Amino acid sequence: MNAEGRVAGRAVTREEIIAKLRETAPDLRAEGVTGLAIFGSRARGDARQESDLDLLVEVAPRSKFSMLNLIGVEHIVEAATGLRVQATMRRSLDKRMRERIADDIIEVF
């Protein structure tokens, strides 16, 4: 995948994104990530070329995972996929947001 999230001139598919995320799992786990999911337009399959990749990040309950770690996760995923990434801690979602994205979520690991 190139820096625009394209493979050989075509937009990257949801399945290709998930495969890349699973390949990066060891690096993400080294950052403290215990679970990862995608949601939003890339998960639904209706993303445009400029759409970002929305991630839900899970960490161990008492870990010292910081905003810097979350930014590190974004950088790892951006490098692997060529997509702009917006990472959110799953535990930080309020009830309304959880309900809004529930149907979009695809667990990666």
Model-derived segments and spans:
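Catalytic core of pol beta-like nucleotidyltransferases
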Residues: 1-35, 44-49, 60-109
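Conserved histidines in hydrophobic membrane contexts and catalytic metal-binding motifs
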Residues: 38
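P-loop (Walker A) phosphate-binding loop of NTP-binding proteins
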Residues: 41
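A short, structured beta-strand/loop element
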Residues: 49-51, 55
